[in-house]
């Protein structure tokens, strides 16, 4: 991978801020990027007036995209590149110690290069899968260039948010897209709330209209409750006698990352399956009306709503098992490749002069203690978010069960970061501690 360094150095990047970014500036940059994202979602791609198959509606929820516009691919290329790199490193095909800062920077650079390549690969797949109807070779080329270029812009908008804003661009785009879907679905002119009230006035209340809203609220409460659960490890300062503290480890240790990666993987399987089917190679399944009807693609497609679950319970069970296993796998890979493993966390705690209360001061002792919590929490939290996302899909929550889960989790994390940013600005001493 080191042979790619000359190429990586030539890829444009958003420079790191030369000075500390204030809270107001972070809000400003986050707002600017959000506005640009919505503007791009309103700019139609030339010749993109064809009917969109139902499969691409699922792609929109997971990848924060809007088919037929500049953000047709959404964050798909970014997430797909992340999946590929995670699998390559996690499986040992690429030998790389990501605890070394230089290796981690190289890993991120290669992931960015792969993201740009995937912009063009997925653009070709979309056109080949018939997302824009039947096009002449010239028009197909123009559409590919437009949607690939739009996705490359999103890559750099994600960088801007990561370096100058609050949270990450990926999370921001998903939350924005799903929130819009929930608002329109519940309170729009044809929203479920008005339909339910109308049926109530007519004396024949229809529970089907209010069920998606109730499902969304249930998912919201469950995610917030899970985000508040944590394990606290008592710490003692090695130099200041009597100084104690606590190191909190959240139950949802890996956040929503496993669900994002798993859902994106399943969406890519649908996309590849449809493209191959149109080429006469139905190895992933056959399709009717843009939806898989058999094969791997069918069993990894989302059964949305209770009616779908009841009509084919085997499909629902296989999908749930696959989602949970995939989330656990990506959760483990994510912890190992992002420095959240016990060894890396022990180094961070040790560098602050802290030690586990009641144990001798050494990174090995801290690591041994953390191994009792981090690996089990990684597996349990990954399985939990996978299970919850699946149940939310089965209930038929607005914005898609997976989308609601991701949005609530993302917004909650952004809320926590906003509080930290505000406290840091008011109390500089606390800022130093939080940064460490």
From Swiss-Prot:
Residues 47-55, 130-140, 192-209, 278-312, 398 are extracellular. Keywords: Cell membrane, Membrane, Protein transport, Translocation, Transmembrane, Transmembrane helix, Transport. Pfam families: Plug_translocon (PF10559), SecY (PF00344). The record marks 75, 79, 174, 179, 260, 406 as: Pore ring. GO terms for cellular component: plasma membrane. Residues 1-28, 89-110, 162-168, 228-255, 332-382, 413-436 are cytoplasmic. The keyword tRNA-binding does not apply. InterPro entries: SecY, SecY/SEC61-alpha, SecY_CS, SecY_dom_sf, Translocon_Sec61/SecY_plug_dom. Its main location: membrane. It is a multi-pass membrane protein. It is found in: Cell membrane. It comes from the Archaea. GO terms for molecular function: protein transmembrane transporter activity; signal sequence binding. Signal peptide: none annotated. Disulfide bonds: none annotated. The chain crosses the membrane at residues 29-46, 56-88, 111-129, 141-161, 169-191, 210-227, 256-277, 313-331, 383-397, 399-412. Residues 56-63, 64-69, 70-88 dip into the membrane without crossing it. GO terms for biological process: SRP-dependent cotranslational protein targeting to membrane, translocation. Component of the Sec protein translocase complex. Heterotrimer consisting of alpha (SecY), beta (SecG) and gamma (SecE) subunits. The heterotrimers can form oligomers, although 1 heterotrimer is thought to be able to translocate proteins. Interacts with the ribosome. May interact with SecDF, and other proteins may be involved. HAMAP family: SecY (MF_01465). NCBIfam families: 3a0501s007, PRK08568.1-5. Belongs to the SecY/SEC61-alpha family. The central subunit of the protein translocation channel SecYEG. Consists of two halves formed by TMs 1-5 and 6-10. These two domains form a lateral gate at the front which open onto the bilayer between TMs 2 and 7, and are clamped together by SecE at the back. The channel is closed by both a pore ring composed of hydrophobic SecY resides and a short helix (helix 2A) on the extracellular side of the membrane which forms a plug. The plug probably moves laterally to allow the channel to open. The ring and the pore may move independently. This is Protein translocase subunit SecY. It comes from Methanocaldococcus jannaschii (strain ATCC 43067 / DSM 2661 / JAL-1 / JCM 10045 / NBRC 100440).
């Amino acid at each position: 991978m080191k042979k790619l360094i000359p190429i990586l150095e030539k890829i444009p990047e958003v420079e790191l801020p030369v000075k500390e970014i204030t809270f107001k500036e972070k809000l400003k940059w986050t707002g600017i990027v959000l506005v640009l994202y919505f503007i791009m979602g309103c700019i139609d791609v030339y010749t993109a007036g064809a009917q969109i198959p139902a499969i691409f509606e699922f792609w929109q929820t997971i990848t924060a995209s809007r088919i037929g516009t500049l953000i047709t691919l959404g964050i798909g290329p970014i997430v797909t590149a992340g999946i590929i790199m995670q699998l390559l490193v996690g499986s040992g095909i690429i030998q790389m110690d990501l605890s070394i800062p230089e290796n981690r920077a190289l890993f991120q650079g290669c992931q960015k290069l792969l993201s740009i390549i995937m912009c063009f690969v997925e653009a070709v797949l979309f056109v080949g899968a018939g997302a824009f109807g039947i096009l002449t070779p010239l028009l197909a080329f123009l559409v590919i260039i437009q949607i690939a270029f739009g996705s490359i812009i999103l890559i750099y908008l994600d960088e801007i948010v990561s370096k100058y804003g609050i949270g990450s661009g990926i999370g921001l785009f998903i939350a924005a897209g799903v929130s819009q879907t929930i608002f329109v679905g519940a309170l729009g002119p044809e929203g479920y709330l008005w339909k339910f009230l109308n049926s109530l006035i007519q004396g024949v209340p229809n529970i089907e209209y209010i069920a998606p809203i109730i499902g969304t609220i249930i998912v919201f409460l469950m995610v917030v409750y899970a985000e508040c659960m944590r394990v606290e490890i008592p710490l003692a300062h090695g130099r200041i006698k009597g100084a104690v503290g606590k190191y909190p480890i959240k139950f949802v240790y890996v956040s929503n990352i496993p669900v994002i990666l798993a859902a994106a993987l399943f969406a890519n399987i649908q996309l590849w399956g449809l493209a191959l089917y149109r080429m006469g190679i139905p190895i992933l399944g056959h399709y009717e009306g843009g939806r898989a009807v058999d094969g791997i693609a069918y069993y990894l497609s989302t059964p949305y709503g209770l009616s779908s679950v009841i009509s084919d319970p085997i499909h629902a069970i296989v999908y749930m098992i696959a989602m949970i296993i995939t989330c656990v796998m990506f959760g483990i890979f994510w912890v190992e490749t992002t420095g959240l493993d016990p060894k890396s966390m022990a180094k961070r705690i040790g560098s602050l002069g802290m030690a586990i209360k009641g144990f001798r001061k050494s990174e090995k002792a801290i690591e041994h203690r953390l191994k009792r919590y981090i690996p089990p929490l990684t597996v349990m939290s990954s399985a939990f978010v996978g299970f919850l996302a699946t149940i939310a899909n089965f209930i038929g929550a607005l914005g898609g069960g997976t989308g609601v889960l991701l949005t609530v989790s993302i917004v909650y994390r952004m809320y926590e970061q906003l509080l930290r940013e505000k406290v840091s600005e008011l109390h500089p001493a606390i800022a130093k501690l939080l940064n460490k």
